[in-house]
């Protein structure tokens, strides 16, 4: 009696193939460490894929992680801030819910990892 049969999982590279517009309740970009232009393309494509009420979640290694955190890519060109993600969303109709820097404990390490986290939602009743 689960809901698994109601879920359609899609694993795809939104930087290469745009998902169908207005089809998804959730778009997740987890540790999508791309150069700024490619990240913007991927974030906007994921945003366009959301139905009304749909949620976009973007989480990845923050640029500060390079000098003050631990782990993650050691290339500043693929690290980002929450503000950079929200700038990519400025041309969309998504409503920002959360945009912040998050410190994440890492086992057996004295420093935290530093992540950028953004959540935004397409308003109900909107299809563009």
Language-model-derived ranges and their functions:
Residues 105-128:
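Core SAM-dependent methyltransferase catalytic element
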Residues 15-26:
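A short acidic, Gly/Pro-enriched loop at the edge of an enzyme's catalytic core
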């Amino acid at each position: 009696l689960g809901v698994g049969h109601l879920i359609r999982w899609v694993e795809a590279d939104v930087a290469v193939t745009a998902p169908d517009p207005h089809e998804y309740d959730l778009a997740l970009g987890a540790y999508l460490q791309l150069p700024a232009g490619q990240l913007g393309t991927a974030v906007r494509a994921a945003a366009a894929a959301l139905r009304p009420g749909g949620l976009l979640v973007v989480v990845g290694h923050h640029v500060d992680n390079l000098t003050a955190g631990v782990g993650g890519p050691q290339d500043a060109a693929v690290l980002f801030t929450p503000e950079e993600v929200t700038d990519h969303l400025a041309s969309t109709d998504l409503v920002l819910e959360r945009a912040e820097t998050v410190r994440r404990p890492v086992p057996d390490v004295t420093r935290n990892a530093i992540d950028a986290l953004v959540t935004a939602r397409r308003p109900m009743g909107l299809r563009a």
